[in-house]
């Protein structure tokens, strides 16, 4: 169930072991969050170091044997893709280099045009099509079929003609993504008031509810990969913020700060790792009983506006829906970005205290001129906000993806609350991911490939019924 990277990898693996495979896909095209991503995947090389690094990232929330299995299997990711005909390029290393053994982490992606994720997805889709694996599109799964012994023997889907039942002669693999677009689950498990999302709107927690109904335990429900983003009426998904990334290639684009909804600056903007940005914005004020940083505002000047798009419009669900202007002027005309000739007037436009915002910008500018920032921002990035006009855009903690879902073991078997495998049920991908409190860039796609192969292999080896 699910036709993204995890589902496609599992299907390819099972097919190549002579299993008969049918895939159910909720949308018309498939791709899920894979196609909306930047396409990087982990492929560990120093295995012992990678195990230590990922164990530290998990903070004890993922058993050691599962991490070891992930590392060993993910070390085959490049080899496996190359064996299918893909061309691979290096992408980088650890996204949290301050954590132990970070040098062991390497990331790669499939070479090609597009955002990286689409390239990987198109390659895997072609492999599925090449094998003539049946894919039932626009057929969301509704429930798992369980016999009186507790074994999963099929799945019920629904298409335009009504409900259909698919008998599983060996097993069912759930690879249907997370709950980025399910408000009920987000309110139950995630902190803060609002988490918008960048990826596939079809990710509404279907696999979580279906697996719970047949007795699955769940884990990592409060774990996410969450950068900053901007949300506008008329778009189901948010746009990924780009300022911190843009700054690296243009020093003039450093003239920006983050302020809360009262106008106070609260963080070194460049110290935040992209996937962990959300954690700085879900602070709850126990005196005012509110989340003062939801929304926050990015304040910047004309030099930043001229430096390029302030969003990453080549990834996320909006990438084929809207093309952001290169100089941000169209979005200013839409009032998505507010502008004013002075900071005080800008504060009035966005409805925050002009004294606080003015002081925040003045204090930041003093630090720039003295090369000594109050929040410790690197002196090389201290460019004063002083070239009018001035701009503001609201920003929220957003989701690349959630990590929670049915708990699984090192063999990709989905477990009940007592740690016992539910017969005939496997999981792969971000649904019940192994990632816990801290996330490594490319870790989910690395997991889609690694546990997709594990799930496909083990499901194919199940005794037929």
Locations of the language-model features?
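Conserved redox-cofactor binding core of oxidoreductases
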Residues: 72-163, 169, 182-184, 231-233, ...
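A glycine-rich dinucleotide-binding beta-alpha-beta segment and adjacent secondary-structure elements
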Residues: 143, 356-435, 439
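An anion/pyrophosphate-binding glycine-rich loop and adjacent beta-alpha core
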Residues: 208-210, 217-349
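Short, well-ordered coil/turn residues at beta-beta hairpins
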Residues: 1-2, 158, 168-169, 174-176, ...
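Glycine-rich FAD pyrophosphate-binding loop
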Residues: 15-37
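Glycine-rich loop(s) and the adjacent beta-strand/alpha-helix scaffold that form part
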Residues: 159-163, 167-236, 445, 451-454, ...
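Glycine-rich active-site loop/strand segments that organize a redox cofactor
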Residues: 42-70
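N-terminal Rossmann-like FAD-binding beta1-loop-alpha1 element of flavoenzymes
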Residues: 1-23, 455, 459-460
């Amino acid at each position: 169930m699910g036709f993204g990277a995890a589902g496609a990898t599992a299907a390819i693996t099972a097919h190549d072991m002579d299993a008969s495979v049918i895939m159910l896909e909720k949308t018309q095209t498939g791709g899920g969050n894979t196609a909306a991503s930047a396409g990087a995947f982990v492929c560990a090389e120093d295995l012992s170091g990678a195990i230590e690094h990922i164990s530290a990232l998990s903070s004890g929330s993922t058993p050691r044997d599962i991490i070891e299995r992930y590392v060993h299997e993910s070390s085959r990711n490049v080899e496996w893709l190359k064996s299918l005909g893909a061309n691979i390029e290096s992408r980088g290393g650890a996204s949290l280099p301050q954590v132990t053994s970070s040098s062991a982490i390497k990331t790669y992606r499939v070479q090609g045009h597009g955002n990286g994720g689409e390239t990987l997805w198109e390659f895997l889709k072609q492999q599925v099509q090449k094998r003539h694996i049946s894919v039932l599109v626009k057929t969301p799964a509704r429930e798992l079929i369980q016999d009186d012994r507790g074994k999963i023997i099929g799945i019920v889907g629904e298409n335009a003609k009504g409900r259909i039942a698919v008998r599983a002669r060996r097993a069912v693999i759930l690879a249907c993504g997370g709950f980025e677009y399910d408000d009920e689950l987000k309110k139950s498990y995630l902190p803060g008031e609002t988490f918008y999302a960048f990826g596939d709107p079809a990710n509404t927690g279907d696999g979580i509810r279906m697996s719970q109904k047949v007795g699955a335990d769940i884990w990592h429900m409060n774990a996410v990969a969450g950068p900053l983003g901007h949300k506008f009426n008329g778009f189901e998904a948010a746009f990924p913020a780009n300022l911190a990334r843009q700054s690296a290639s243009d020093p003039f684009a450093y003239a920006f700060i983050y302020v809360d909804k009262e106008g106070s600056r609260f963080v070194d903007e460049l110290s935040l790792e992209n996937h962990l940005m959300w954690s700085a914005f879900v602070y709850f004020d126990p005196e005012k009983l509110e989340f003062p940083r939801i929304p926050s505002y990015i304040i910047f000047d004309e030099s930043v506006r001229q430096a390029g798009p302030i969003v990453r419009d080549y990834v996320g669900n909006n990438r084929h829906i809207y093309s952001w202007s290169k100089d941000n002027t169209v979005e200013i005309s839409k009032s998505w970005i507010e502008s004013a000739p002075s900071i005080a007037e800008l504060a009035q436009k966005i409805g925050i205290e002009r004294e606080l915002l003015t002081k925040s910008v003045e204090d930041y500018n003093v630090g720039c001129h003295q090369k000594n920032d109050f929040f410790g921002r690197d002196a090389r990035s201290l460019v004063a906000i002083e070239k009018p006009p001035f701009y503001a855009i609201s920003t929220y903690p957003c989701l690349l993806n959630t990590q929670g879902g049915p708990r699984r073991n090192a063999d990709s078997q989905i477990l009940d609350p007592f740690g016992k495998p539910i017969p005939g049920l496997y999981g792969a991908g971000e649904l019940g991911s192994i990632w816990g409190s801290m996330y490594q860039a490319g870790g989910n796609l690395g997991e889609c490939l690694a546990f997709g192969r594990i799930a496909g292999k083990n499901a194919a080896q199940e005794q037929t019924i």
